[in-house]
């Protein structure tokens, strides 16, 4: 513990020293900076040279990782130990993308035979639906899938579909998550029940939002196909076979997963069966392979050359060394536009904790607030604040080096904006440059005195740039695994359990208490504000 405390002190001192300097000057002071802070891994190119650390800051961050025993924690995770201590569970989403026959154990018990058996069932089902061997009740092949889930049962598969979907898919995949009935109505308005397969994703088959939408979907099917016909249009991803049977799902269309797979890590599992069907098994297998490639890198690479470790350390340097409490993730890729929403759950649900496994308060700040959207759209939205606002927000900018999609010339324009923003965030624009430009335009000295400060960019905004060689199932899998392992490393260093989520429970309990009051007029005990709102809604 003393070594860890000392490492934190060194990091904070190094960050303070680096924070008084300009990032662009580090390149002159450190001739090897670009080589030291760029990596090529599994089809991804990472450039961390525009981050706010200098050589001493990077060294202090790596010392902190060693002091926190990141290597030991990494080994314990891959060995299947119960690193989710509050629930006594192993954490083995990595097993879902491991090759058949790999030696993977959860709490000492081999798991790959079961994992591969489920994968083979998924593959057979996906191929049968795509080929038309599995049909609907009226003999028509399925041309659409309605995927119903929420949280990890929605965000991951939805992002995965955006990344993998063909331009003109043979099967239309749509998603419903929210308990707001408008989403269900708008999503299903032009769908044909005779040609739609409904896939319900809920491990316990009790999730309120999911089961409300599942009930609506079943009623929609029954109205068109009758009770028995509706059953032929159902599949489920769940471990509650009694509940799926009662709902009408045939047993051979229920696909399970394991308690060592957390919801926000479950897109590698049968949770994404809908995508495997709609995009094709080869695409889904490529996604698994890309994740496995990043796993191998993370498991074996030394910390100073380890992509997930370095991305995590950059965030810790910003969060804890420089007190940057938010981070913006901007993919310059329409297919990756939902990445920030996915990372909000992955990172903020994993590391949004203020208490460690020992029940003691965390000694330092933990998860940052993650936000973002696709570039170049965000340049016309919140980038004004990013460039000239009073707070500095570190960024991750993500691009795709080569793309054959869309009209000629557009991808180069997209990439030019990506590179320009990364450079502008770092170098900024000096007042002298602005004054010279305005003077050349004949602007008066009085106007220059007021305009120049407004047009000055301080720069010195740190960013990491990630380039995918191409957006393929493999590189997308590597990207998601990169962020998963980054999140794990941060949790280890912060001394928290990244794999439970007690913070989501309280609201569920209270919603279940309030629902009868809205439905039947029952009364309950609430604070004055909540009680007043309930009375207003009862009118």
From Swiss-Prot:
Active-site residues (renumbered): 349, 380, 508
Keyword Cytoplasm: yes
One GO cellular component, as annotated: cytosol
Pathway listed: Carbohydrate biosynthesis; gluconeogenesis; Carbohydrate degradation; glycolysis; D-glyceraldehyde 3-phosphate and glycerone phosphate from D-glucose: step 2/4
GO biological process terms, semicolon-separated: gluconeogenesis; glucose 6-phosphate metabolic process; glycolytic process
Compartment(s): Cytoplasm
Enzyme Commission number: 5.3.1.9
Region span, Disordered: 519-539
InterPro entries on file: G6P_Isomerase, G6P_Isomerase_C, Phosphoglucose_isomerase_CS, SIS_dom_sf, SIS_PGI_1, SIS_PGI_2
Enzyme class: isomerase
Pfam families: PGI
Keywords, in A-Z order: Cytoplasm, Gluconeogenesis, Glycolysis, Isomerase
GO molecular-function term, one example from the UniProt record: carbohydrate derivative binding
Catalysed reactions listed for this entry: alpha-D-glucose 6-phosphate = beta-D-fructose 6-phosphate
Record-linked NCBIfam families: PRK00179.1
PANTHER family found in the cross-reference section: GLUCOSE-6-PHOSPHATE ISOMERASE
Family: Belongs to the GPI family.
Role this protein plays: Catalyzes the reversible isomerization of glucose-6-phosphate to fructose-6-phosphate.
Protein's recorded name: Glucose-6-phosphate isomerase
């Amino acid at each position: 513990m003393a070594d860890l405390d000392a490492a934190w002190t060194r990091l904070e001192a190094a960050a303070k020293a680096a924070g008084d300097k300009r990032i662009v000057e580090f390149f002159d002071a450190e001739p090897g900076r670009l080589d030291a802070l760029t990596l090529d891994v599994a089809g991804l190119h990472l450039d961390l040279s525009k981050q706010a650390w200098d050589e001493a800051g990077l060294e202090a961050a790596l010392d902190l990782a060693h002091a926190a025993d990141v290597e030991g924690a990494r080994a314990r995770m891959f060995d299947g130990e119960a690193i989710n201590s509050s629930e006594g569970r192993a954490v083995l989403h990595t097993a879902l993308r491991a090759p058949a026959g790999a030696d993977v154990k959860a709490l000492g018990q081999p798991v790959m035979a079961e994992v591969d058996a489920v994968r083979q069932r998924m593959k057979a089902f996906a191929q049968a639906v795509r080929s038309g061997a599995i049909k609907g009740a009226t003999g028509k092949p399925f041309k659409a899938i309605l995927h119903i889930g929420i949280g990890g049962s929605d965000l991951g598969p939805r992002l995965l579909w955006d990344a993998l979907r063909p331009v003109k898919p043979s099967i239309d995949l749509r998603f419903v998550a929210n308990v707001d009935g408008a989403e269900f109505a708008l999503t299903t308005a032009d769908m044909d029940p005779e040609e739609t397969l409904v896939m319900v994703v809920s491990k316990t088959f009790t999730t309120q939002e999911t089961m409300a939408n599942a009930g609506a979907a079943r009623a929609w099917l029954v109205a068109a196909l009758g009770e028995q016909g509706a059953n032929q249009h159902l599949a489920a991803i769940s471990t509650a076979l009694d509940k799926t049977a009662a709902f009408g799902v045939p047993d051979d269309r229920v696909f399970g997963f394991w308690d060592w797979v957390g919801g926000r890590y479950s897109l590698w599992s049968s949770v994404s069966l809908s995508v495997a069907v709609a995009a094709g098994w080869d695409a889904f297998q490529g996604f698994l392979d890309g994740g496995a490639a990043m796993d191998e890198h993370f498991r074996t690479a030394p910390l100073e050359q380890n992509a997930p470790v370095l991305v995590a350390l950059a965030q810790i340097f910003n969060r804890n060394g420089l007190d940057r409490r938010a981070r913006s993730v901007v993919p310059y890729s329409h297919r990756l536009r939902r990445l920030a929403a996915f990372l909000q759950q992955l990172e903020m649900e994993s590391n949004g904790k203020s208490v460690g496994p020992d029940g003691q308060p965390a000694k330092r700040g933990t998860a940052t607030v993650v936000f973002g959207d696709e570039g170049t759209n965000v340049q016309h939205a919140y980038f004004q604040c990013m460039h000239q606002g009073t707070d500095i927000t570190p960024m991750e900018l993500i691009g795709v080096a080569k793309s054959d999609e869309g009209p000629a010339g557009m991808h180069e324009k997209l990439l030019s904006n990506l590179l320009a923003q990364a450079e502008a965030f770092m170098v900024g624009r000096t007042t002298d440059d602005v004054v010279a430009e305005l003077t050349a335009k004949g602007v008066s000295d009085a106007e220059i005195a007021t305009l120049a400060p407004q047009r000055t960019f301080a720069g010195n905004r740190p960013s990491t740039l990630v380039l995918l060689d191409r957006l393929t199932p493999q590189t997308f899998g590597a990207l998601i695994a990169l962020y998963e392992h980054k999140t794990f490393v941060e949790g280890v260093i912060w001394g928290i359990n990244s794999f439970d989520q007690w913070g989501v429970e309280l609201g569920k309990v209270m919603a279940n208490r309030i629902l009868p009051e809205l439905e039947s007029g029952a009364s309950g005990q609430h604070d004055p504000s909540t009680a007043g709102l309930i009375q207003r809604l009862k009118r």
